[in-house]
């Protein structure tokens, strides 16, 4: 039991010595780091001053040989000073801890303020960018609408030009067709004139029949005249395709409608060896149609209503 008490006493003394050294080192560190003496608490300064005064008094007494109190008084005084130093050190640590907390809170507030300012600036920048984008998009929409309107106008103008062109082409085609028909009929008349000498008997009979038909009360006599010359067609078939016109004139007289005549004539062209007429089938068709109209006109002139 006694050994335990001695061990506890020695441990306490060692602990107090270590604390004293730590507090002394902490004070030196504080002073060496440039910290202000005012940062220490008033109690700490008073305790350190009393401790130094006591040390100086002990040293003077030791030098002069004087004794200050008994041994037990010195020990209790030393312990009291150590405990007061410990309490002052703990208070100092608490003050530093509070200062650290205050600094942390201040830093957090400053960071929060900076973050809020940065977020506000970034949001303002985003709003400005969005406004710029919306303006650019509006300009694009306006430009596209203008392009669509311009394209619609161009299409309308193109359609109008095409309509005018189609009208011009139709007029040209009609005029050209009339010109071709006129030229073909002129050629047909010239062909008749050229063959008048070779086919004089046939033409004489045909012209005679036409003259008689103009004087008679019926147009059917033309068919009789052509029928009488049918023998001459067979005889002169190899000379020229012109002889077919005389036969077709007979068909035109006997037919009920120009359509029937055209179909019969085109069918007959396929059974005869007439190369120059087969190569110009379309022109022949037009010429026959005009020729049939000519025959109908003759019929109306001969038999007025």
UniProtKB/Swiss-Prot annotation:
Locus of motif RxLR-dEER: 45-60
Task: Give the glycosylated residues.
Answer: 207, 227
Note whether Glycoprotein occurs among the keywords: yes
Disulphide bond pairs: none
- Regarding domains, what does the record say? The RxLR-dEER motif is required for the delivery of the effector to the host cell cytoplasm but does not bind phosphatidylinositol monophosphates. The C-terminal region (residues 247 to 269) consists of one W motif, a conserved motif found in already well characterized effectors that may be involved in the interaction with host proteins.
Family the entry assigns: Belongs to the RxLR effector family.
Q: Provide the function of this protein.
A: Secreted effector that confers enhanced plant susceptibility during both compatible and incompatible interactions between the pathogen and its host. Promotes the sexual reproduction of the pathogen in the plant host.
Name listed for the protein in its UniProt record: RxLR effector protein 17
Q: What's the source species for this entry?
A: Hyaloperonospora arabidopsidis (strain Emoy2) (Downy mildew agent)
Taxonomic lineage of the native organism: Eukaryota, Sar, Stramenopiles, Oomycota, Peronosporales
The gene that this protein is the product of is: RxL17
């Amino acid at each position: 039991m006694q050994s335990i008490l001695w061990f506890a006493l020695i441990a306490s003394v060692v602990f107090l010595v270590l604390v004293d050294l730590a507090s002394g080192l902490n004070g030196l560190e504080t002073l060496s780091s440039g910290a202000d003496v005012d940062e220490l608490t008033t109690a700490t300064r008073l305790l350190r001053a009393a401790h130094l005064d006591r040390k100086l008094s002990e040293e003077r007494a030791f030098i002069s040989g004087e004794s200050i109190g008994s041994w037990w008084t010195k020990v209790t005084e030393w312990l009291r000073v150590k405990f007061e130093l410990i309490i002052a050190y703990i208070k100092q640590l608490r003050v530093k801890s509070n200062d650290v907390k205050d600094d942390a809170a201040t830093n957090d507030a400053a960071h929060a303020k900076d973050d809020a300012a940065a977020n506000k600036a970034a949001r303002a920048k985003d709003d400005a960018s969005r406004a710029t984008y919306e303006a650019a998009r509006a300009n694009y929409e306006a430009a596209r609408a203008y392009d669509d309107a311009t394209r619609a106008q161009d299409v309308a103008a193109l359609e109008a030009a095409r309509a005018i062109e189609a009208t011009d082409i139709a007029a040209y085609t009609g005029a050209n067709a009339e010109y071709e028909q006129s030229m073909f009929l002129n050629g047909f008349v010239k062909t008749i004139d050229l063959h008048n000498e070779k086919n004089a008997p046939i033409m004489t009979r045909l012209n005679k029949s036409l003259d008689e038909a103009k004087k008679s009360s019926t147009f059917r006599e033309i068919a009789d005249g052509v029928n009488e010359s049918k023998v001459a067609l067979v005889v002169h078939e190899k000379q020229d395709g012109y002889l077919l016109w005389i036969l077709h004139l007979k068909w035109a007289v006997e037919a009920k409608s120009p359509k029937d005549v055209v179909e019969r004539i085109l069918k007959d062209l396929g059974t005869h060896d007439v190369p120059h007429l087969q190569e110009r089938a379309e022109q022949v068709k037009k010429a026959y149609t005009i020729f049939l109209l000519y025959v109908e006109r003759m019929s109306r002139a001969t038999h007025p209503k």
